[in-house]
Amino acid sequence: MSVLLCCQALSLSLFAQQQKVDTAHIYSIPEIIVSDPYQTREVRSASPLQVFNKEELKNLQALQVSDAVKHFAGVTVKDYGGIGGLKTVSIRSLGAQHTAVSYDGITVSDCQTGQVDIGRFSLNNVDRLSLNNGQSDNIFQPARFFASAGILNIQTLTPHFKEDKPTNIAAEFKTGSWGLVNPSLFLEQQLNKKWSMTANGEWMSSDGHYPFTLRYGNDADVQVSKEKRRNTDVENLRTEISAFANLSDKEQWRLKAYYYQSSRGLPNATTLYYDFSRQNLRDKNTFIQSQYKKEFSRKWVFQTSAKWNWSYQNYQDPDALTSVGGTDNSYYQQEYYLSAS
């Protein structure tokens, strides 16, 4: 019996060795999908980059762009005088003169002060806020950005519509301490499949009469009184109108018109219980800017930007001791800008 089993096993092994395998045969295997989470731009950037999107900006409960910028790491935001004062941003303690501010990819400039007041930009129509510590990876940035230590990019909203809803309207009303009133209105309209437009505006007013404790005298005979800050009122008006054209999948055009005006009281230092002040600062700024982008192929892309900017600033101090009885200074700025790459 054992001899028979050995013979059968030997014959089976010989048959297996003699059988040929078809190496040219194609074998089909089930499809395999390999996925990995998309790395955000902050991770892929060659220089340090911080970004706040629209949802994150809502969670910050910020009123102005300057309030949101304070949440970036390594940033110094100088606030000169509360809600109506000048607000500047500085990176790596190099000063506001070395930090560029971009509004929809085009430089914001102020030749009068040399510093951009980021407090005049609202968050109502901001879609994305980013801060580059160093040079940006965007090769289509203006030449001015290459001379800056950092870049604050403010990207406004791009309209999106549903198939059966060509109009979007949003209204907000904010109020707070010290007489703060801030209504705003936002409108998006789809004209056709290629053309759309947006319009938004806001008005903000506040008396700024915040309370403070005034102390005079030494520790043995200190005098304490409750006072309120005076001549700290502020009134701002901002409007924007934008037109968008998606001429094709590889061709886009954008046009924006912006207007801003403000009137702010400038309080004096309180000296011997005297805090009277009639100083006032008025600002007006308007600009029109346009961007055009065309992709010819995967290797060739053309982009051009143009801007016209006009600004006016007036400072008044009727109580200044001058030969003409007071101070009334006005400053004007007009700028034309064109960039192509």
Q: What role is predicted for each listed range?
A:
Residues 153, 178, 186, 190-279:
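Periplasmic-side early beta-strands and strand-to-turn transitions of outer-membrane beta-barrels
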Residues 66-107:
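Extracytoplasmic beta-strand/coil segments of soluble accessory domains associated
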Residues 244-262, 281-341:
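Face-selective signature of the C-terminal outer-membrane beta-barrel domain
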Residues 123-170:
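A beta-strand signature from Gram-negative outer-membrane beta-barrel systems
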Residues 18-58, 66, 96, 133:
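Short, acidic, small-residue-rich periplasmic hinge/interaction motif at the N-terminus
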Residues 83, 144, 176-179, 229-236, ...:
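Short sequence motifs at beta-strands and strand-loop junctions characteristic
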Residues 99, 163-169, 174, 181, ...:
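Outer-envelope beta-barrel architecture signal
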Residues 30, 87, 148-150, 167-169, ...:
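Hydrophobic, lipid-facing positions within transmembrane beta-strands of outer-membrane proteins
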